[in-house]
From Swiss-Prot:
Transmembrane segments: 181-201
Domain notes per entry: The PDZ-binding motif interacts with PDZ-domain of scaffolding protein DLG4.
Keywords: Cell membrane, Glycoprotein, Membrane, Phosphoprotein, Postsynaptic cell membrane, Signal, Synapse, Transmembrane, Transmembrane helix, Wnt signaling pathway
Extracellular side: 31-180
Subcellular compartments: Postsynaptic density membrane
Region feature Disordered, mapped onto this chain: 241-294, 469-495
Sites where a glycan is attached: 37, 62
Residues exposed to the Cytoplasmic side: 202-525
Topology of the protein relative to the lipid bilayer: Single-pass type I membrane protein
Name used for this protein in its record: Protein shisa-6
Protein family: Belongs to the shisa family.
Length: 525
């Protein structure tokens, strides 16, 4: 018994060695499969992959599947040698395929690994290049994947990380430091300045090239001034005094000559009647009256005072007016010393420079641009017959009658102020402005003043005369052209062109007052 126990272990050991020797060829094939291509054991159940892990961390070129269905040595002690032989025959008939590893191509994109296990077409090998791999069926063209290095991402593909940097306190937006709006403001300001400068330049150019305005009076304004009638001398005096007393405006030339003496008179020889008359010499501008008393502004003269003091709204007073009222002859305005004073060179140059339109409708002012009238003395003509004195409007329009010879009184009489202002002289029928019988008839004809020209001694009345001269051609006829007409036509022209005190405008017509005038030609009607 003891011997039997001693021999039993060696027998079992020898049996195991014999069994190991029987399974030796399949084991060698398995060792070769791990070093070469990976194969699939045909004896594996369901074609399950048996080969395992990649050698060297999965970087080996080809891996061989280990036959999992082969029993290991000593695992099945009860199998027979016939079963071991059948397993060896099946291992020789196995089909092998390769797997292409994952790699980065030329564009830097990663391609995943794929298996070449299409056994029907025979594409079982991984072929191509390191950057382009595909399956093929030619064993000698397969790719040695262990020599490729494109298993890591290339450097040029790696993009730097973009980190969002939050703005610090120095990078914050400050509206006060923003200067982008300044450009808009500057551009708009320059455009506005250019527009304003252009407008001012246009206005200045128009004013510089504008033609000078002429002294034209509208017809309607002239009609209104004509219908207003003559202005009383007292009113003219007030306006003239206010115009003279007021201080001149700034930069306005002040006349060096006095305006107080508008119509100087001269002293003439005494007549046999021992009566003195002051006759105005209209063409003289240097002599001053010697018998006049100081009066306010000395505007009124012997030519205007008698009519002014006896002025009335009744036609019955026409009988006391001199014959020159009926002749209605316009005189030359340039012969008056008042107009000569207005045409001084200094004032003319100033007002022509200013180019103001004279406001002739405003009272108390003088015309700015005085019309230069011809001062040439016309040729002497035959003096017309003296018309009869107007007693009424009907008699003025009546046919011409014979003139009495009582009018032929001395013409060089000089009247004193007391005689001119006396009641007898005012209501007398003697001619106040009778022409002189001298060798120069034009001086006597120039004194034939119409009803509206009695007030011609002041600048205000000169303004109205110029208004009528510019507005109506019939009102500015020459004195000699008027004298050439018939006597009846002259009467009608005098009262038709300027009806200032017509019946429609008279508010009260007093009765005729018979006064003793001590006149040689007194006629009572």
């Amino acid at each position: 018994m003891a011997l039997r126990r001693l021999l039993l272990p060696p027998l079992l050991l020898s049996l195991l060695l014999s069994l190991a020797s029987l399974h030796l060829p399949p084991g060698a094939d398995a060792a070769r499969g791990r070093s070469g291509n990976r194969t699939l054991n045909a004896g594996a159940v369901g074609g399950r992959r048996a080969g395992g892990a990649l050698a060297r961390g999965g970087r080996e070129l080809n891996s061989t599947a280990r036959a999992s269905g082969v029993p290991e040595a000593g695992s099945r002690r009860g199998q027979s040698a016939a079963a071991a032989a059948a397993a060896a025959a099946a291992a020789s008939a196995t089909v092998t395929y390769e797997t292409c590893w994952g790699y980065y191509d030329v564009s830097g994109q990663y391609d995943k690994e794929f298996e070449c296990n299409n056994s029907e077409s025979g594409y079982l090998y991984c072929c191509g290049t390191c950057y382009y791999r595909f399956c093929c069926k030619k064993r000698h063209e397969k790719l040695d994947q262990r020599q490729c290095t494109n298993y890591q991402s290339p450097v040029w593909v790696q993009t730097p990380s973009t980190k969002v940097v939050s703005p610090g306190p120095e990078n914050k937006y400050d509206p006060e430091k923003d200067k982008t709006n300044f450009t808009v403001y500057i551009t708009c300001g320059v455009i506005a300045f250019v527009i304003v400068a252009g407008v001012f330049a246009k206005v200045s150019y128009d004013k510089a090239h504008r033609p000078p305005r002429e002294m034209n009076i509208h017809r309607a304004l002239a009609d209104i001034l004509r219908q207003q009638g003559p202005i009383p001398i007292a009113h003219c005096e007030r306006e003239t005094i206010s115009a003279i007393d007021t201080s001149p405006k700034e930069n306005t030339p002040v006349r060096s000559t006095s305006k107080n003496h508008y119509t100087p008179v001269r002293t003439a020889k005494q007549t046999p009647g021992d009566r003195q008359y002051n006759h105005p010499i209209l063409s003289s501008a240097t002599q001053t009256p010697t018998h006049e008393k100081p009066r306010m502004n000395n505007i009124l003269t012997s030519a205007t005072e008698p009519y002014d003091l006896s002025f009335s709204r009744s036609y019955q007073n026409l009988a006391h007016l001199p014959p020159s009222y009926e002749s209605a002859v316009k005189t030359n305005p340039s012969k008056y010393s008042s107009l000569k004073r207005l045409t001084d060179k200094e004032a003319d140059e100033y007002y022509m420079r200013r180019r103001h339109l004279p406001d002739l409708a405003a009272r108390g002012t003088l015309p700015l641009n005085v019309i230069q009238m011809s001062q040439q003395k016309p040729l002497p003509r035959e003096r017309p017959r003296r018309p009869i004195r107007a007693m009424s409007q009907d008699r003025v329009l009546s046919p011409r009658r014979g003139l009495p010879d009582e009018f032929g009184m001395p013409y060089d009489r000089i009247l004193s102020d007391e005689q001119l202002l006396s009641t007898e002289r005012l209501h007398s029928q003697d001619p106040l402005l009778s022409p002189e019988r001298t060798a120069f008839p034009e001086q006597s004809l120039s004194r034939a003043i119409s009803h509206t020209d009695v007030f011609v001694s002041t600048p205000v009345l000169d303004r109205y005369r110029m208004t009528k001269m510019h507005s109506h051609p019939s009102a500015s006829n020459n004195s000699y052209a008027t004298l050439g007409q018939s006597q009846t036509a002259a009467k009608r022209h005098a009262f038709a062109s300027r009806r200032h005190n017509t019946v429609e405008q008279l508010h009260y017509i007093p009765g005729h007052h018979t006064c003793y005038t001590a006149s040689k030609t007194e006629v009572t009607v």
